[in-house]
Swiss-Prot record:
The gene coding this protein: gN
Main location: virion
Membrane spanning residue stretches: 56-76
UniProt similarity note: Belongs to the herpesviridae glycoprotein N family.
Keyword check for Membrane: yes
Subunit structure, as described in the record: Interacts (via N-terminus) with gM (via N-terminus). The gM-gN heterodimer forms the gCII complex.
Virion surface-facing ranges: 22-55
Top-level taxon of origin: Viruses
Name of protein: Envelope glycoprotein N
Amino acid sequence: MTWKLFICFLSFGVIFLRVSSLTEKSHTTSYTILHNNNFYSNSCSADTYVPSIKTFSSVWAILNVIIFFCASLFYLRHLCIVKFISNLTK
């Protein structure tokens, strides 16, 4: 059991190092900042926003949403089963 845990932590470490090296490279490259002057206008809406999956924070946020959604489903499933069993045993 411990060697499986070791391999799991090792693989997460390798993935983390790859992600951190990708983000470090992006800091050294030059880029231009595009300012959107229409951000506060009425024409700006959520339809014009394009999410990016290239950053670690975006991937982390998506992963957190998926985990929260699955946990909510499991909790609601548990509540339904408990209520069903309590109704059966009355």
